């Protein structure tokens, strides 16, 4: 099971539990959800520390500051690739840069061209 599937399952479980308790505004349910999110983040950071070299981790941290959504996507893909055994561990900064380029190219929006036809 990949981390994204685990995350989705946990989110569904938390939502179901909140609905069962009728606790849309219950501080206890919010605290539990926040605690589970923190545990998930800690687990993710632990895995990333094992996968990435120090330079690659600092690069990822800078990306996270500039583009949080892109960084989240990169983290998920790194974890999935590492679990599949498709990454050299620890991941060097040079390899990480190449991987970032490939991920960016896959996800960049299609270039829009506007042509003006004159009569």
From Swiss-Prot:
Keywords attached to this entry: DNA-binding
Highest taxon of the lineage: Archaea
GO cellular component terms attached to this protein's record: cytosol
Chain intervals for the UniProt region annotation (Disordered): 1-37
Basic and acidic residues composition-biased segments: 1-12
GO molecular function annotations of the record: DNA binding
UniProt cross-references to HAMAP family, sorted A to Z: dsDNA_bind (MF_00026)
Protein family per UniProt: Belongs to the PDCD5 family.
PANTHER family: PROGRAMMED CELL DEATH PROTEIN 5
Protein name as annotated: DNA-binding protein MmarC7_1157
Organism of this sequence: Methanococcus maripaludis (strain C7 / ATCC BAA-1331)
């Amino acid at each position: 099971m990949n981390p994204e599937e685990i995350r989705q399952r946990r989110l569904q479980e938390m939502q179901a539990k909140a609905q069962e308790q009728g606790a849309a505004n219950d501080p206890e349910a919010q605290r539990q959800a926040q605690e589970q999110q923190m545990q998930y983040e800690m687990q993710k950071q632990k895995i990333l520390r094992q996968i990435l070299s120090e330079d690659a981790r600092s690069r990822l941290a800078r990306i996270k500051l500039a583009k949080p959504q892109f960084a989240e996507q990169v983290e998920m893909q790194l974890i999935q690739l590492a679990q599949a055994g498709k990454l050299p561990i620890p991941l060097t900064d040079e390899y990480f840069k190449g991987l970032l380029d490939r991920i960016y190219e896959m996800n960049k929006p299609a270039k829009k061209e506007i042509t003006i036809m004159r009569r």
